[in-house]
Amino acid sequence: MYTLLDILKGLPLLAVAAIASADYPTIPSDLTTPVQQRLAISGMNSVSVGWNTYEKLLKPCVQYGTSSTDLSQETCSLISTTYNTSRTWSNTVILTDLTPATTYYYQIVSTNSTVNSFFSPRTPGDKSPFTTSVVIDLGVYGADGFTVDADGDPTRKVLIPEVEPALNHTTIGRLADTWDDYEWVLHPGDFGYADDWYLTPTNVGDGVNAYEAILENFYDQLAPIAGGKVYMASPGNHEADCEELGTPAIELSCPEGQKNFTDFNVRFGKNMPTSFSSTSSNTKAKVNANKAAALANPPFWYSFEYGMVHVTMIDTETDFPNAPDAPFGTAGLDGGPFGYTGQQLDFFEADLASVDRTVTPWLLVAGHRPWYSTGGQSNICSACKTAFEPLMYQYGVDLGVFGHVHNSQRFAPVNNSVVDPAGMDNPTAPMYIIAGGAGNIEGLSSVGNNISSNRFAYAETFSYATLTFEDENNLSIQFIESATGDILDSSTLYKAHTEQFVNQ
């Protein structure tokens, strides 16, 4: 990893003050033009539509319907928010009472917008097969965010000068090319890498604008995906602060708008759900679901259901004992807290306890920092393991999805570092994957030292994962090479799911 001092040493004397500002996207002449569009599951039969504009909207509105030529329904809100250093306002409108598993067309109300479409969420309990794509640690491409492998080998550089509208490269391009193969996207942490602005020397003279420019460019690049697919987000360390190294001198210079997950919270806070009302016939499940809803704090920790899976999103950065990004944490990022002491773990237990396997047989937990990884101690979050792993085992979580380490990894079902003897055939321990190789300015992390529970590790090119919920008992996991679409690894987890509620 480069440091700011390394960058400054490489510059001519007294040149810093004369460096050009970062490359912002052009502001449209119509300031109501929607940009950076994003969709999310907001609740049962509900989808939130989020977008940014270059002026505050008094009443953001969305027109929609099941025909592209008949957008006869309209919903509006009063949600148009910003923060100190942002050039844009984040707008949110929630579309409710949608027919499940149906193609809807929508248009953000503006004098300069187009019609887009999305597939509405499946009802909890729908046992139809579906696939979700998992993309983590995804950065901006172009002048502010070229990608280069972390090992520094110049023969393995990947320089991407610009992003064409066709999205014909790497992970975003593969998501576009395989549009019909998946129904929604899971992205637990690290968006854009604006806090790495100092790695591009031309940014060093104007870090405040460089940070915002990277965010604007990244979310513009992501919009063709996130504006047409439900895109579920939770935080990573690169959302925490204006720079990622935890250097006190830079910490003090971070403006208020670029501290404490501000952009992430403003951008996604009104889009993500709290948790779903339980559709279980069990009274205790309903009580736990209601408790979880009261304790949820989106976009940091929350849950949702889609067809036959219950997904619990966690914050591995703050709000649990010894959290790495918390004040005085090991990462030095001074983030949070976002709830009362113990709130996230209270939510986590109530939410897991609420899951009725006759409705949603599959239980998935997604967060950013892993506690199983190759490459040594620096790649794992021991505090996360202490906080979350016992509850994941107790309530029978089937799969843990994480990133942070910039490669792709798959692990045998494991608990407390002991591999489940059943392997992939009805284990009691959770299976874990890392899908952190999507591509960003920091490049790929070498596989490094292996561990006994690892079954696959890949760090040669950018990649991501897909999860296919085949039926109530079989979950297929594939890792895909972004550039080619080749399958790098494929496995299937079998779970009998004979118990309505798991507590082991």
UniProtKB/Swiss-Prot annotation:
<feature type="signal peptide">
    <location>
        <begin position="1"/>
        <end position="22"/>
    </location>
</feature>
<comment type="subunit">
    <text>Monomer.</text>
</comment>
<dbReference type="Pfam" id="PF00149">
    <property type="entry name" value="Metallophos"/>
</dbReference>
<comment type="similarity">
    <text>Belongs to the metallophosphoesterase superfamily. Purple acid phosphatase family.</text>
</comment>
<dbReference type="InterPro" id="IPR039331">
    <property type="entry name" value="PPA-like"/>
</dbReference>
<dbReference type="Pfam" id="PF16656">
    <property type="entry name" value="Pur_ac_phosph_N"/>
</dbReference>
<protein>
    <recommendedName>
        <fullName>Acid phosphatase A</fullName>
        <ecNumber>3.1.3.2</ecNumber>
    </recommendedName>
</protein>
<dbReference type="InterPro" id="IPR015914">
    <property type="entry name" value="Purple_acid_Pase_N"/>
</dbReference>
<feature type="glycosylation site" description="N-linked (GlcNAc...) asparagine">
    <location>
        <position position="84"/>
    </location>
</feature>
<dbReference type="GO" id="GO:0046872">
    <property type="term" value="F:metal ion binding"/>
</dbReference>
<feature type="glycosylation site" description="N-linked (GlcNAc...) asparagine">
    <location>
        <position position="450"/>
    </location>
</feature>
<feature type="glycosylation site" description="N-linked (GlcNAc...) asparagine">
    <location>
        <position position="260"/>
    </location>
</feature>
<dbReference type="InterPro" id="IPR029052">
    <property type="entry name" value="Metallo-depent_PP-like"/>
</dbReference>
<keyword id="KW-0325">Glycoprotein</keyword>
<keyword id="KW-0964">Secreted</keyword>
<dbReference type="Pfam" id="PF14008">
    <property type="entry name" value="Metallophos_C"/>
</dbReference>
<dbReference type="InterPro" id="IPR025733">
    <property type="entry name" value="Purple_acid_PPase_C_dom"/>
</dbReference>
<keyword id="KW-0732">Signal</keyword>
<dbReference type="GO" id="GO:0005576">
    <property type="term" value="C:extracellular region"/>
</dbReference>
<dbReference type="InterPro" id="IPR041792">
    <property type="entry name" value="MPP_PAP"/>
</dbReference>
<feature type="glycosylation site" description="N-linked (GlcNAc...) asparagine">
    <location>
        <position position="112"/>
    </location>
</feature>
<dbReference type="InterPro" id="IPR004843">
    <property type="entry name" value="Calcineurin-like_PHP_ApaH"/>
</dbReference>
<keyword id="KW-0378">Hydrolase</keyword>
<comment type="function">
    <text>Acid phosphatase involved in the regulation of fungal phenotypic traits and virulence in C.parasitica.</text>
</comment>
<dbReference type="GO" id="GO:0003993">
    <property type="term" value="F:acid phosphatase activity"/>
</dbReference>
<feature type="glycosylation site" description="N-linked (GlcNAc...) asparagine">
    <location>
        <position position="168"/>
    </location>
</feature>
<feature type="glycosylation site" description="N-linked (GlcNAc...) asparagine">
    <location>
        <position position="474"/>
    </location>
</feature>
<dbReference type="InterPro" id="IPR008963">
    <property type="entry name" value="Purple_acid_Pase-like_N"/>
</dbReference>
<feature type="glycosylation site" description="N-linked (GlcNAc...) asparagine">
    <location>
        <position position="415"/>
    </location>
</feature>
